[in-house]
Amino acid sequence: MKKNAPKSFEEALSRLESLTQSMQGEMPLEDALAAYQEGNELVRYCQTKLAQVEQKLQVLDTDGLKELNLESDE
């Protein structure tokens, strides 16, 4: 993120929600483009943070530590 990088995942998510609400209303084209670009950066930031957390989540198994599969239906 360039300017005003979020301090946390929650801050980024809150800003993203705010941008989404703003873009649902009437907004000049240039402002909409700037909001879209900022939103895109925030999405990438959030995806990176989530990937980092997912990598850290591990469960103890009989064979030792293994990665936690969050997409499992178990």
UniProtKB/Swiss-Prot annotation:
Transmembrane segments: none annotated. GO terms for biological process: DNA catabolic process. GO terms for molecular function: exodeoxyribonuclease VII activity. One of its GO terms (cellular component) is exodeoxyribonuclease VII complex. Its EC number is 3.1.11.6. It comes from the Bacteria. It is found in: Cytoplasm. The keyword Cytoplasm applies. It catalyses: Exonucleolytic cleavage in either 5'- to 3'- or 3'- to 5'-direction to yield nucleoside 5'-phosphates. Its main location: cytoplasm. Pfam families: Exonuc_VII_S. Keywords: Cytoplasm, Exonuclease, Hydrolase, Nuclease. InterPro entries: Exonuc_VII_S (IPR003761), Exonuc_VII_ssu_sf (IPR037004). HAMAP family: Exonuc_7_S. Belongs to the XseB family. Heterooligomer composed of large and small subunits. Bidirectionally degrades single-stranded DNA into large acid-insoluble oligonucleotides, which are then degraded further into small acid-soluble oligonucleotides. This is Exodeoxyribonuclease 7 small subunit. It comes from Neisseria meningitidis serogroup B (strain ATCC BAA-335 / MC58).
